[in-house]
Amino acid sequence: MSAPNHSYDPVEVTPLHPDEVARMRDEALEAIAKASTLEELKKVRIAHAGDRSPLALANREIGALPPAARADAGRRVGGARREVNEALKARQAQLEEEHEARVLVEETVDVTLPYDRIPRGARHPLTTIAERMADIFVGMGFEIAEGPEVEAEWYNFDALNFLPDHPARTMQDTFFIAGPDGEESGMVLRTHTSPVQVRALLDRELPVYVVVPGRTFRTDELDATHSPVFHQLEGLVVDEGITLAHLRGAIQLFVERMFGEGLRTRMRPSYFPFTEPSAEVDMECFVCRGASVGNPEAPCRTCSSEGWIEIGGCGVVNPRVLVAAGVDTERYSGWAFGLGIERTLMFAHGVKDMHDMVEGDVRFTAAFGMEM
């Protein structure tokens, strides 16, 4: 049997033939020279110097050559790739310089033009409305409380009497935080500001009178009336002898100071795990004052001619929540409420679309915000 032939003929491996390597290099250099914009040069870089470029694929085939032939082929391919990369670098520097020169010409500032006042910034309307809402309750003797936005499930659900099978505890409603290993961590993006109720009861001496403005998160699609990120103003009172009448009075005072004197409020029975009894709070429409009800000739867009506008939920704090926070339910009672800050802004300023609040358009901020 004759011995195997280990000699290397570069013609047998077409991508590594000297002429083929030179052709690939020349094609790359020609494409680089023709690139007239940085975007075109980016495409040339991918095509002629990327991981799937002809020279890169040829470089991978060097390992299949006989050992004696690898060094020569490696120098040849490596030299070609080096030339291509150096040409890319030089062309990019040239195009960047040309782009900068073009921008300087196109965006030249004529210093001889008359001076215009520089537009002043404005605080976001959500910030100003949240502070205004909180200030009303601070005027009643409440304190501001805050809590983390990444919250433990115990504070967000268990301590607030959410049963394990409650729909809110599913991924369809809640953003769950994965641990470092990708498994469950027991943490969520808080779905409401109510966890701060429990934290306030655990951290403060009784009695507790707090309001909690803050950002919350739910898996809602962004549309005209919903957003996955929204803001709430939570209120909590826990003291001796507290009744639903005190809650009704606080809500009434808030509505009158926020929307106008003489507006009526009402409560409709509802259900929340952390309050019992629970209620939805409506206020009399501050535009039509009920005059549009049953009057097709004078419809009201604000209340849809119903005469009432829903503004939030409330109720007497469920004893189980107080027990979870270590409060003596024989001695203390309390109530809580939750108001939507975006919803309040929509009513106060006639904002129709949630997109306007979250997309960061400075024109919206300038129109409804407070100038700095």
Curated annotation (Swiss-Prot):
Keywords: Aminoacyl-tRNA synthetase, ATP-binding, Cytoplasm, Ligase, Magnesium, Metal-binding, Nucleotide-binding, Protein biosynthesis. It catalyses: tRNA(Phe) + L-phenylalanine + ATP = L-phenylalanyl-tRNA(Phe) + AMP + diphosphate + H(+). It is an enzyme of class 6 (ligase). Its cofactor is Mg(2+). One of its GO terms (biological process) is phenylalanyl-tRNA aminoacylation. PROSITE patterns: AA_TRNA_LIGASE_II (PS50862). One of its GO terms (cellular component) is cytoplasm. Mg(2+) binds at E276. GO terms for molecular function: ATP binding; magnesium ion binding; phenylalanine-tRNA ligase activity; tRNA binding. Its EC number is 6.1.1.20. Tetramer of two alpha and two beta subunits. HAMAP family: Phe_tRNA_synth_alpha1. This is Phenylalanine--tRNA ligase alpha subunit. It comes from Thermobifida fusca (strain YX).
